[in-house]
Amino acid sequence: MTADLLQRKHLLLRCEGLDTLATVLVNGVEVGQADNMYRLWEFDVKKLLKVGSNNIEVRFAPALPFIRSKEAEQHLPTWQYPGAAYIRKMPCNFGWDWGPTVVTCGIWRNIALVAYDTARLDDVRISQDHGQKDKVKLTVQVFTQTAPSAGLKVQLVLTSPDGKPGKPVESTLINGQGTVELTVQRPQLWWPAGMGKQPLYTVKVDLLDAQGRLLDATQRRIGLRTMQVLEQTNSTPMQFVVNGVPYFAKGANWIPADAFPTRSTKAQLRQFMADAVAVNMNSLRFWGGGYYEDDALFDACDEFGICVWMDFKFACSTYPAYDPNFLANVRQEASEQVKRLRHHPSIAVWCGNNEIMFFRGGNEWKWVPKEKIGSDESNLGKMSTPDYNRLFKDTLGGVMRKLAPQSAYVTGSPDCGDVHFWDVWHGGKPFDAYRGIHGFISEFGFQSFPVPATAAAFTAPEDRNSVYSPMFKHHERSNRSSVDSIDDGQIGTDKIMKIVRMNFREPKDFESTLWLSQINQAYGIEFAAEGWRREMPKSMGCVYWQYNDNWPSTSWSSMDYFGRWKALHYRARHFYSSVLVSGDFNPTNQTVALWLTSDELKPVQGKLNWQVTDLAGNELGAGKLSVTQTAQKSSVVGTIDLGQLVKAHGGTNLLVWLKFDGGGKLTTDNVVLLARPKQLPLQDPQLSFTASGSGTNYTVTVRAGKPALWVWLDIPGVEARFSDNFIHIAPGAPAKFNVQLTKPMSKSELLKSLQAQSLFSTYKQ
């Protein structure tokens, strides 16, 4: 501490993240306490500091004794760890059905010393008016923390997406507040991925004293756009509308990227968003059981065009909304997070909670008798509707109305017309059940095992003989979401294998079981996504559970903890493509309806080619259609009558190959199966491959002598990213894969190590 710094009028210790029950001391003197992981804490420390070295000490109390004592006083009905709702700490810290119980404590975000004399910026609110054609009016409200003084000014500079700064605009502050207005001519609008570009403007705000000296400064990157959330009506589904254009939300549910948040890097978070855009996603739902993510993640969403469904951090439990102190704590938490994040164009909607509507009851709380706590009836209690409204409509809704009136807010999910559909995983129904649900599907999913390389990261060789080995089951959490659960992962593993065997044949070994579970997961989610995209606008959103993992595990994810793509992630590139060709087989009349689904904002023209083969690859029929599809439309564009072919060859011996060629990114293909994959008498596809390239970049061409379903490339022991995987290859139609290696290999080394496998290779022969 220098003498000059010590002379400043105000010296504040700023703690941006304390997890969670903390006492802060400076030079041995307590300056304050913290009890909310999500809040920013500032303490006046000027009188305690001295020139030279100073000591800052943060003492943390464990969370478990605290919540257990609160729970002993009054049990809160919950699906998760008893008592966890009493503390403002990330719920999944206490375990979830995809992650471990690691109840952390510590300093998890920056600590800084803030010094100022006259004034500092407290809040900058930016609103947009798109009411005039080819113009956007910006209103920037500035709020400061200041001592009574005259002559303070604010200066604003708007920099365009191409980096050109505009003329400075000034305004004099009155009572520490001021407003600056400016108009953007010929605005460049921000669009979700796949709909247009993501131009970002920078608003720089300088706080000046009467002599023009800089006192404080901040900046915000914004996108010029309008965003609406239309909740479900009797005739229309829930949907998002950007810049006046409705769009189909294609994405997944995001969970914390690590069980220990401080281990996630900006580069990793950015790569996650790049991987979303790479498979044609435009949306991610930031689920309510984690934490408010770092600015770097939202910056990446802004840049890539990923629209965020932003949950406040309340999930799967009742909360003590009858306690004024709890509500005050939440109000401050929400205010700080809304101020920090509301300017991001990627945030499409704020949502009060995840699945707490299932705990909402009548006018009074329904408490669980103490003798039934811990039994099957312990979760049957209800939160009173007045307290639910007090928390999610009045407190959080009030913060949104005050601080972000232009942002969409809904009280909960699935409480706004969206659907969480779990009859397949939890109910054990076949994938066919997905066709019986409609609307905006914001949660649904099925688990798969990780890739062999990830499995090797948490198992010993003796664990890799069976997916039922103790360590392997330990990393499957679906029926033991908290530390006190006793199930060993058997139930979740059984669920995976039940549906795998329903759809596919018996895998031949451990590694084949891992791969086949991923093919099964991709098969089910693709079946669901195709159906919902076909019926647009009856359904306007498909957001599967889940995008990522927070540890190496068996889970619902399409991309694992290490960022390795599973089969589902590769297939998402196809079923989320801007133009989707698909076929729907009707076993009653033996026809295949040919669907063309387009998210493009302009009409699409092209040729739709179809071919029918047997499982030996012999062509039995073919045709070509000239197709024009209107913008943002899905419809049947043709029909194939297979009656005679089914009669002659049997449906289990037929494949229908589809390809729509609209040029460039508008080219898409698909395969229609007339029976479950297990019923197909597949033949050895006789896969072969060649390679060209060098170093870390290669192009691999794969050929099949017989029809090959779900073909994938792998290089055991080598980290690689493939341009595509788990695709279908017909004889005479070789497929090209771009291969990106993390370390260079010679071509001979690559050809020696590379493996090309297919569904056929996973089966016992």
Predicted regions span which residues?
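Intrinsically disordered, low-complexity Pro/Gly/Ser/Thr-rich segments with frequent PxxP/GP/PP motifs
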Residues: 169-188, 611, 615-649, 719-745
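Active-site neighborhood of glycoside hydrolase catalytic domains
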Residues: 303, 320-415, 562-563
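Extended acidic/polar, glycine-enriched regions
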Residues: 47-55, 141-232
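Terminal connector regions
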Residues: 205, 209-218, 640-683, 742-765
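Active-site-adjacent substrate/metal-binding segments within catalytic domains
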Residues: 7-15, 19-26, 32-35, 118-125, ...
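Accessory beta-strand-rich segments of carbohydrate-active enzymes
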Residues: 1-120, 283, 291-293, 306-309, ...
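Short glycine/proline/serine/threonine-rich loop/turn segments at secondary-structure transition edges
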Residues: 6-9, 49-53, 66-68, 186-200, ...
